[in-house]
Amino acid sequence: TRRMGYWIDMKDPYITYDNKYIETLWHLLAELYKKGLLYKGYTIQPYSPAAGTGLSNHELNQPGCYRDVKDTTCTALFRIVRDQQSERLFKGVDGDVYFMAWTTTPWTLPSNTALAVGPAIRYVRVRSFNPYTGAPLTVFLAKDLCPAYFPKKNEDLPMDGYEAGGKNVPFRVEGEYVGKDLAGIRYEPLLPWIAPDGDAFRVITGDYVTTEDGTGIVHIAPTFGADDDRVAKQSGIPPLVVVDRAGKRQPMVDRTGKFFRLEDLDPEFVRTHVDAAAYGEFAGRFVKNAYDPTLSEADPTLDVDLCMKLKFEGKAFRIEKHTHNYPHCWRTDKPVLYYPLDSWFIRTTAVKDRLIALNRTIDWKPESTGSGRFGKWLENLVDWNLSRSRYWGTPLPIWATEDHGELKCIGSVA
């Protein structure tokens, strides 16, 4: 170590599994607990099915964790329910009207319970054809993104005589709306395998909806996205959950990264909430091939099979490959999911401003490290997910009564 220029105390080393070190951590955790900065939360977190544990924001931002991957994407068609509230959207239309929503994770579509629009974004109603089936259809999407799906040169093409598969799909823009005016409109579930409890399948507004890509309409699956969960709660949208054999409410995907098998669900829940025939076709399938040791990258993915089902049912407008940046687990090198988990957190956001101020007092070498990577991390700070589902490491010194009516945080073995 001397030749390496590495300073280390070999006589009294810093070892994380040493009881003195663990007790020091217990003391610090107890102090945080007294100050109300240590809490248990049920939130959407980065989760590694391959490692079987949640990951912290810091772990996810290590070099190399985000990488470009090519996935199957789908622009899905959500049929609007025609009722008194939506009647104005059907003016001059004989058939059905749809919302178009794009996703890079088609496996989350069965868990959809809402669609989000930008309150100030302008949307257009377009009359055209389904390029896969050739059937006439009328759709809503953001005005700024209309050219990505309906090139201007096709606007003057004749509307009669179009055949499925034709590259140039004729269209007409028939109306313009503001996002906030679409809020509350109901639509039919895209894949009605499992019935959620509560007021689902309606349009809500979201402050994070943009017109940078997609259609300007965001598919919301509250169990698999932090932003989805936040805007859904704000609008009273329920998540789509299943009930397992132990009576616990779970997302449709289990901890290993696959759709729950029917035999692992509560029989009464299956009887009252599940279309067993439709869901059974995909039950037990892994959402990513990387989680299944029997599959390779060359095997068909769940995303592809779901997209083909939607295409066959006339519920897909565009299916294509798309390269995007996706997080991977630094331990297993496999993709992570955003997943609802019980975890213990340190409320770092409560001292965010002070952390940023103190960071500016540090004489970083080079300076760009402090203002760049570390500074940006502090600016986007979230509460620290502290707990891990593993058998090594420092045990959390928190004890609770069976009814969780009383909690104690032990700060010392003494």
Describe the predicted segments one by one.
Residues 11, 18-66, 71, 77-83, ...:
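Gly/Pro-rich turn-and-neighbor structural signature
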